[in-house]
């Protein structure tokens, strides 16, 4: 019988350090079959909308994601079958024509702002993490990321943060903290928490051998 992969959910607010925590886990297991799948890859296709309409999309609301597809593909990976993960184009605000082939792995990190919001996703996870970072730090990181990587203007980032991102965080994301097995204050700089998580993952991997 094929062993079930370990699935780790990593969530928290935008710019909170989720990706850094996920990479810290990835880097600790170089000899294992381990990968990270981002919820952001599953933003819904918006090619049927005009560019002006796409720009107004609330990307921090659960309905912005095709979570059904993510769950379907995770179940395929659990069963040992490869999947083609969608690629989202942030400059065009819609799904790209490209996909990325993902082979089954021993450890799958599922990362995103709302990965603990859907019970069906939570039920697939062995470990659930919430990265808890101060609002001021998160907005600074978001400004830097969106200007450098997503060709956004400062004004548009600040407007989106105050009108959408911050309210959605308190409405949808922060409440999922109660589902977390571990809450990590200050993200990847919390070495003790990262070490505890890596120890737990190593223990599960050893038990599965």
Swiss-Prot record:
<dbReference type="Pfam" id="PF00485">
    <property type="entry name" value="PRK"/>
</dbReference>
<dbReference type="GO" id="GO:0004849">
    <property type="term" value="F:uridine kinase activity"/>
</dbReference>
<comment type="pathway">
    <text>Pyrimidine metabolism; UMP biosynthesis via salvage pathway; UMP from uridine: step 1/1.</text>
</comment>
<keyword id="KW-0963">Cytoplasm</keyword>
<dbReference type="GO" id="GO:0044211">
    <property type="term" value="P:CTP salvage"/>
</dbReference>
<keyword id="KW-0808">Transferase</keyword>
<comment type="similarity">
    <text>Belongs to the uridine kinase family.</text>
</comment>
<keyword id="KW-0418">Kinase</keyword>
<dbReference type="InterPro" id="IPR006083">
    <property type="entry name" value="PRK/URK"/>
</dbReference>
<dbReference type="GO" id="GO:0005524">
    <property type="term" value="F:ATP binding"/>
</dbReference>
<keyword id="KW-0067">ATP-binding</keyword>
<dbReference type="GO" id="GO:0005737">
    <property type="term" value="C:cytoplasm"/>
</dbReference>
<keyword id="KW-0547">Nucleotide-binding</keyword>
<protein>
    <recommendedName>
        <fullName>Uridine kinase</fullName>
        <ecNumber>2.7.1.48</ecNumber>
    </recommendedName>
</protein>
<comment type="pathway">
    <text>Pyrimidine metabolism; CTP biosynthesis via salvage pathway; CTP from cytidine: step 1/3.</text>
</comment>
<feature type="binding site">
    <location>
        <begin position="12"/>
        <end position="19"/>
    </location>
    <ligand>
        <name>ATP</name>
    </ligand>
</feature>
<dbReference type="InterPro" id="IPR000764">
    <property type="entry name" value="Uridine_kinase-like"/>
</dbReference>
<dbReference type="InterPro" id="IPR027417">
    <property type="entry name" value="P-loop_NTPase"/>
</dbReference>
<dbReference type="InterPro" id="IPR026008">
    <property type="entry name" value="Uridine_kinase"/>
</dbReference>
<dbReference type="GO" id="GO:0043771">
    <property type="term" value="F:cytidine kinase activity"/>
</dbReference>
<dbReference type="GO" id="GO:0044206">
    <property type="term" value="P:UMP salvage"/>
</dbReference>
